[in-house]
Regions:
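Active-site proximal loop and beta-alpha junction motif in alpha/beta enzyme cores
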Residues: 1-71, 77-280
Length: 280
């Protein structure tokens, strides 16, 4: 099996969010235990296992070093950028995932249509959430909500970018809270007048990801959240900057349409290629 390391949401190696990608050469996926072992060996936040049916149809399964997840935005962007570069995908593609079927435009910039977004819950008692971030200055005008655009993520507003960059997150507390709320991550954001829609940080220690430098799914959820809060119109394009505190700045592009369809995407850079010397 061929494997690749691809940095998503950047056009430069060692920027953006790295993902592992395994291109399968059989009609069936390996056993789950083996895919988990491979993801653990590669040590990236997510590894995508890609099965190609044709140049326009694929199936992807996603594994963190700890568990399988239904969807990973940045690993999908990375995978289709690589497939395009290898001449294995072009134009409008259909991708089957456990979160549902995704419509993807494969090219030098990859855009993927997300699952129909929805607000799962509004969290009224937020003291423990902000305490887990060591934040005392809340953002009282905007709610803390669990939003779904393929995965459930907790949207947490902060009053300014300085507070965002100075966070001292308690990973154990975040793990416990996300487990209790059945959410994947704390997706924390703040506004600034610098041309970006928002600056964001994402913490998912429950899935062995202390912090992620670019999170496609969660930023899609944030786009819908901001629209529902009245910060965006019925149709909008957004650019979220993430990963600054990690030294891996990433730009995640999103688009929400009048019909409610939601897209997320960006560029990528292929960093490495190799062969897994194992028998399936």
């Amino acid at each position: 099996m061929k494997y690749f390391i691809v940095d998503a949401f950047t056009d430069q190696p060692f920027g953006g969010n790295p993902a592992g990608m395994v291109l399968l050469d059989s009609d069936t996926f390996p056993k789950e235990e083996l895919m988990l072992q491979i993801a653990t060996e590669l040590r990236y936040s997510e590894t995508a296992f890609v099965k190609r049916h044709s140049a326009q149809e694929f199936t992807i399964r996603y594994f963190t070093p700890k568990a399988e997840v239904e969807l990973c935005g940045h690993a999908t962007i990375a995978s289709f950028f690589l497939l395009h570069r290898k001449g294995l995908a072009s134009g409008q593609c259909l991708c089957h995932t456990k979160a549902g079927d995704l419509h993807i435009e494969a090219g030098e910039k990859v855009m993927m249509q997300m699952a129909k977004p929805r607000i799962i819950a509004t969290i009224d008692e937020t003291e423990d959430i902000y305490q887990a971030l060591d934040v005392k200055n809340y953002c009282p005008t905007m709610p803390v909500q669990i939003v779904y655009a393929g995965l459930p993520d907790l949207m947490i507003p902060l009053p300014d970018v300085a507070t965002l960059q100075a966070l001292q997150p308690d990973m154990q507390a975040i793990s416990e809270i996300t487990k209790q709320l059945e959410a994947v991550s704390f997706h924390v954001f703040a506004f600034d007048n610098d041309g970006y829609t928002a600056h964001v940080r994402d913490f998912a220690p429950l899935y062995d990801i202390p912090e992620e430098s670019a999170t496609g799914t969660a930023n899609a959820s944030l786009t819908y959240y901001l629209q529902q809060c009245g910060c965006l119109g019925n149709e909008a394009e957004c650019a979220f900057i993430q990963g600054e505190a990690m030294g891996r700045p990433s730009v995640v592009t999103t688009r929400i349409q009048v019909d409610g369809n939601l897209f997320v995407g960006g560029r990528a850079a292929v960093v490495a290629e190799g062969t897994l010397m194992i028998e399936v």
